[in-house]
Amino acid sequence: MNTATKLLRGGVRAYQLTLSSVLGGQCRFYPSCSAYAMEALAVHGALHGSALAARRILRCHPWNPGGVDPVPPAHHHDEMKQNG
């Protein structure tokens, strides 16, 4: 895991330990958006993991029903690049 990924994961962890506990379980998805971000960063790295996390956070609003939304596997991104 590179330095950028570690820093981003540290930021998410800080959010989990501070604001998340104050705001309560508001996420409409499983896993929660912050847990999704942690996993996306670990699996896909800083750049692609951040993009996946941002996309997830933008979908977390009252007009989206939510539900189960796992982080795509690492090979999924590679296949998308190959298939254009």
UniProtKB/Swiss-Prot annotation:
One Pfam match: YidD
A GO-annotated cellular component: plasma membrane
Signal peptide feature range: none
SMART domains, alphabetized: Haemolytic
Localization per Swiss-Prot or TrEMBL: Cell inner membrane
InterPro entries noted in UniProt: Membr_insert_effic_factor_YidD
Origin: domain of life: Bacteria
Family, as annotated: Belongs to the UPF0161 family.
Function: Could be involved in insertion of integral membrane proteins into the membrane.
The protein's name: Putative membrane protein insertion efficiency factor
